[in-house]
């Protein structure tokens, strides 16, 4: 059943981190989760016209302000001339949330191996009546050339305008879904065509990652073992001999 699990959720807390990095134990936590969803949708739709290529959006919160990290293939499109676009975006989000919003833009070095950008590129081509096979094969070739160790793309729906919906997928390299230390980037995108919607799923294997989280967990386990040993203390030879003598009597 490993193939049915979301690869990102399967690795959360080990080699993957949450996209909403804040903590709140108050009853209004549901409102903040909804607010994060609204922020992501607004940023995606707002920057889609600029063709910035948004790979992911990370939201951090404090008591006074909200910090948004936008990972973009074209950061210049997000910032704009003399920072006009980013200032306007922060003001618009400030009016929506009612808090001060700070935006940082991070450039995506290799957009060819970002699953979200691959899915959006294929969706754009399908909406413009490009052959789905051509779009999928081209995306896989570009990702493998850029350094990906494995790519799998699956399209499902009325492919090519067919009356009966079906699913087709192409794969190159390896995609280890059960190996937790394997850095598998996953995304799901929907293409809105004349014939109907087409679901696009993308898996990109970027290699194994031994994160500091794993090392930290191992260090904590070693500390616990040492503490248990120190609490129990070293046993003397007399204690051991007494236990050995007691064994026959206990059995009898």
Swiss-Prot record:
Domain KH type-2: start-end pairs: 39-109
Biological process GO terms, please? translation
In the UniProt record, which is one GO cellular component term?
A: cytosolic small ribosomal subunit
* Keyword set, alphabetical order: Ribonucleoprotein, Ribosomal protein, RNA-binding, rRNA-binding
Cited CDD domains:
KH-II_30S_S3
Composition bias of kind Basic and acidic residues appears in 221-241
Location of the region described as Disordered in the Swiss-Prot/TrEMBL record: 221-252
Q: Name one Pfam family in it.
A: KH_2
The record's GO molecular-function terms, alphabetically, read: mRNA binding; rRNA binding; structural constituent of ribosome
Q: Which InterPro entries match?
A: KH_dom (IPR004087), KH_dom-like_a/b (IPR015946), KH_dom_type_2 (IPR004044), KH_sf_prok-type (IPR009019), Ribosomal_S3_C_sf (IPR036419), Ribosomal_uS3_bac-typ (IPR005704), Ribosomal_uS3_C (IPR001351), Ribosomal_uS3_CS (IPR018280)
Compositional bias of kind Basic residues:
242-252
Assigned protein family: Belongs to the universal ribosomal protein uS3 family.
The UniProt function text for this chain reads: Binds the lower part of the 30S subunit head. Binds mRNA in the 70S ribosome, positioning it for translation.
Question: What does the annotation say about its assembly with partners?
Answer: Part of the 30S ribosomal subunit. Forms a tight complex with proteins S10 and S14.
Q: What is this protein called?
A: Small ribosomal subunit protein uS3
Taxonomy, top ranks, is: Bacteria, Pseudomonadati, Chlorobiota, Chlorobiia, Chlorobiales
